[in-house]
């Protein structure tokens, strides 16, 4: 019995330490995207409108999936886009960048959120259920996208940073915030 109690305490502590990151991810209300060139973009999630999409983004960000990727698409007055893991190894301008993903796709969660300036949404191909890891942030309102792409959050600070993004600008990290 004397040996059992300390072992149970150690086991409980180990489980708590290992479970803490998962619990923190479950409670993430947003994220901070830090660029290598400097600047931060603070995002607030819409879990009530796109629960599986938020869950997927949180999982990928928590794994460091986006760290080191670059923004591969910049359309002035429209969007900036990132999330292709190939951008970690391929050069900006390589035609393959923009075609990659995490190796799976998630079901679309079209919702009532409008494509206003500063929303974050999932990029996809022609198939509505083809989104995986690529996301975009709108630089201006884009109502023609409403109901066609999954909006899962919005920029709450750092739009000046978003507006300064150029093709090739790298993500240093995406940290989850509660």
List where the protein language model places each region.
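Cyclophilin-like peptidyl-prolyl cis-trans isomerases
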Residues: 2-7, 17-178
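Small-residue packing motifs within transmembrane alpha-helices
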Residues: 8-12
């Amino acid at each position: 019995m004397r040996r059992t109690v300390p072992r149970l305490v150690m086991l409980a502590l180990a489980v708590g330490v290992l479970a803490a990151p998962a619990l923190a991810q479950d409670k993430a209300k947003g994220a901070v995207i830090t660029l290598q060139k400097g600047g931060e973009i603070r995002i607030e999630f819409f879990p009530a409108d796109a629960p599986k999409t938020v869950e997927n983004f949180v999982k990928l960000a928590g794994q460091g999936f986006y760290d080191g990727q670059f923004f591969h698409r910049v359309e002035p007055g429209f969007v900036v886009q990132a999330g292709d893991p190939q951008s970690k190894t391929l050069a900006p301008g390589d035609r393959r960048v923009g075609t990659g993903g995490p190796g799976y796709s998630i079901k679309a969660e079209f919702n009532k959120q409008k494509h206003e300036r500063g929303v974050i949404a999932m990029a996809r191909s022609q198939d509505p259920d083809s989104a995986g890891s690529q996301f975009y942030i709108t630089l201006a309102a884009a109502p023609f996208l409403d109901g066609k792409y999954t909006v899962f959050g919005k920029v709450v600070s750092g739009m000046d940073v978003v507006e300064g993004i150029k093709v090739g600008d790298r993500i240093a990290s995406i940290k989850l915030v509660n």
